[in-house]
């Protein structure tokens, strides 16, 4: 096995926090249309669902004022306020949009780190930060870039990263498969119980 290399989070990805609150206000929102752009919110990261939507901005405003905050498939969004550290990768079929002030966009440098490995390492880092800085109360904001980027993590070679990533992917598949089977069994049990009760009546 190759030696693991120490890396800084600032080397592994490009990070962009959402715009200042005054850049996106409710007075700017418009109904969804061909001339609007979706605003991604914390609910998308927390619920791991890109289809959730509430607010839209005029396309011209988003393209001219919020270009730096746009979100594409493959980008990672992270919740930054309140419920912090929820991580979600935007899927291939997701709608184009921009992030609001409560999110951070992460673009992983996949030449040096596998995206799944990054997500695991980043999530662990946030959990450790929360644990060591909570002082008995909830952490309400993600670490500032000045603290986040210098944080160090051990990373294996890309070859080993891919092997580890594939292993986790298979485990996720099995968990999902067994979860679906469990739901089917529970539904069958409920149906049987109801059927027995009806017969007794």
Residue ranges: model-predicted function:
Residues 7-12, 43, 101, 195:
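Structural detector for helix-capping/boundary residues
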Residues 10-16, 26-61, 106:
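DNA target-recognition patches
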Residues 31-32, 80, 96-104, 136-159:
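A short glycine-rich beta-alpha junction/loop motif
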């Amino acid at each position: 096995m190759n030696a693991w290399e120490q890396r800084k989070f600032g080397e592994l990805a490009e990070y962009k926090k959402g715009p200042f609150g005054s850049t996106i206000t409710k007075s700017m929102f418009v109904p969804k249309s061909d001339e609007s752009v979706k605003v991604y919110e914390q609910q998308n990261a927390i619920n791991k669902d890109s289809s959730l939507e509430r607010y839209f901005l005029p396309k011209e405003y988003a393209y001219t004022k919020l270009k730096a905050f746009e979100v594409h498939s493959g980008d990672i969004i992270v919740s930054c306020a309140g419920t912090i550290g929820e991580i979600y990768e935007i899927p291939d079929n997701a709608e184009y949009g921009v992030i609001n002030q409560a999110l951070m966009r992460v673009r992983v440098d996949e030449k040096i780190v596998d995206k799944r490995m990054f997500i695991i390492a980043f999530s662990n880092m946030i959990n450790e930060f929360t644990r060591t800085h909570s002082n008995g109360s909830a952490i309400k904001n993600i670490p500032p870039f000045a603290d986040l980027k210098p944080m160090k993590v051990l990373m294996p070679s890309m070859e080993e990263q891919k092997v580890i990533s594939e292993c986790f992917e298979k485990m996720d598949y099995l968990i999902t498969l067994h979860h679906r089977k469990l739901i089917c069994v529970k539904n069958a049990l409920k149906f049987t119980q109801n059927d027995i009760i009806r017969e007794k009546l």
